[in-house]
C-alpha cells in the first residue's frame, strides 16, 4: 500500500532517501558500535555490538550484549531493531531506517544510541535490567520456549 501511495514516479526518490538515511545513521554511530563491513551501505547495515571501549568486547563474558542494547532502546521509545541476524557476526544488530523517517527522528535515534553506549560504559546495570519503562519488563525466554502456548486462555478469577 505504501508503494502504491507513493506512485511509480516517486519510488526511485524513496529508494535514494532510504540509502541516504542508512548511511547517515551508520556514519554517525561508527565511533560507538563495531562496524564489521566498511563502505557505503544500501538501505540497511549491521553493527557487531558495541565497540570495546563501550563494553562490547566479545571475549569478555561480562560484555554488553546486543540484546541489552535493544531492550534499552525500548526505554527511549524506539522499537528494537532486528538482532542476532544475520548470523555472520556474533552480536549482529541490523539498522534499517526507512525513507519516511525525518532527519529529526534519525538524529534522535542516533543520540539515543550514543547515550546507550555511554550508559554501557558508566552505568551498565541500566542496560542489564532494561527495559525499565515498559508495562512488561524482561520475559523469561527459556520458560517461553519450554512452555510454549500458541493460544490465548483468559485467566479466571
Language-model segments: residues:
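N-terminal cofactor/phosphate-binding cores enriched in small/glycine residues
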Residues: 2
Amino acid at each position: 500500500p505504501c508503494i502504491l501511495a507513493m506512485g511509480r514516479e516517486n519510488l526511485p526518490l524513496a529508494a535514494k532517501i532510504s540509502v541516504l538515511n542508512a548511511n547517515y545513521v551508520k556514519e554517525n554511530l561508527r565511533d560507538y558500535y563495531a562496524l564489521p563491513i566498511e563502505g557505503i551501505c544500501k538501505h540497511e547495515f549491521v553493527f557487531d555490538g558495541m565497540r570495546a571501549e563501550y563494553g562490547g568486547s566479545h571475549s569478555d563474558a561480562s560484555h554488553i550484549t546486543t540484546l541489552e542494547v535493544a531492550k534499552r532502546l525500548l526505554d527511549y521509545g524506539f522499537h528494537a531493531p532486528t538482532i542476532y541476524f544475520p548470523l555472520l557476526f556474533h552480536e549482529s544488530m541490523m539498522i534499517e531506517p526507512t525513507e519516511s523517517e525525518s532527519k529529526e527522528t534519525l538524529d534522535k535515534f542516533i543520540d539515543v544510541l550514543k547515550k546507550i553506549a555511554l550508559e554501557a560504559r558508566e552505568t551498565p546495570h541500566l542496560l542489564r535490567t532494561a527495559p525499565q519503562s515498559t508495562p512488561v519488563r524482561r520475559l523469561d525466554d527459556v520458560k517461553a520456549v519450554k512452555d510454549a502456548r500458541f493460544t490465548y486462555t483468559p485467566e479466571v478469577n
